[in-house]
Amino acid sequence: MSNVIKPVGYKALLDMRQTEMGIKLIKEFFQANLSTELRLRRVTAPLFVLKGLGINDDLNGVERPVTFPIKDLGDAKAEVVHSLAKWKRLTLAEYKIEPGYGVYTDMNAIRADEELDNLHSLYVDQWDWEAVIEKKDRNLAFLEGVVRRIYAAIRRTEYLTCEHYPQLKPFLPEQIHFVHAQDLLDMYPDKTPKEREDAICKKYGAVFVEGIGGKLSDGKKHDGRAPDYDDWSTIAENGKMGLNGDILIWYPVLERSFELSSMGIRVDKESLLRQLKLEGKKDREKLYFHQQLLNDKLPLSIGGGIGQSRLCMVLLHKAHIGEIQASIWPDEMRKECEENGMNLI
């Protein structure tokens, strides 16, 4: 059964040639903006990592990575990355990056268990970034400051795109609104987490939802997070739990909330041990990445991922991510999309 949203009367505002040129424009301009805004150096990223080192991103903990044996390593298993959340932190240490500086990558990943729809594809491309911070920076005020700078880079890119293609009109608000996942639950107790995001994004246009990963007052999580990169359990200065979150916008083309980025201040030793215990994953303490962190071999950091195809989709006013990137889609979805003005690559 296709999960595709079919906007009534949708017609792409750019043809395929303009779309390809627009993708290039957005990717080059935003990447340069992100790099200068956060003082990030580009580094080359892996497509796969060895299994069993604890380096791959476990996402919500249930998605299966694509694996394959390596003949020259005695059929040792490699995993195609889900993201580079933990790999980047190892890279900060390897490159001896100073506080206030960081790295970014062009990350390509395969998520074979993704539920395919307008926003979700088997193929994931994002700017994965990570920056070194000091202990004094592990607070909500610092996190929100970084979010504002990323959002400013997104809005500058929107302005440039609309200047190049006057048929596209800017819609992102000037400011991004901050709200904790617990406050969302209190505001909309009868709604699901996704419905809460829709409601708050429709109200403010752009929102950073904080504290994703820990249990809320109803005993449920707003959404899942792996226990070993984002710090979702430390009590922040507002008295609430979590130093992480998602950048969401209201996307008028699909009339729904739309996640552009997941990011956060990363775990220190204390929060790593606490979160592994909370999630029943204490056995991970012996893995390579976790040992490096527990033995003070890794710097404190903040980081996240920003969807490349998603950002292009939004700024080019497309209704399906398949209008931006080449991937595999069910025949039924391709047919539905074609009938409703969405020409999938």
Predicted regions: what they are:
Residues 47-51, 166-172, 212, 332-334:
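A glycine-rich phosphate-binding loop feature that marks nucleotide/adenosyl-phosphate handling sites
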Residues 110, 181-345:
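A translation/RNA-centric and nucleic-acid-associated enzymatic feature enriched
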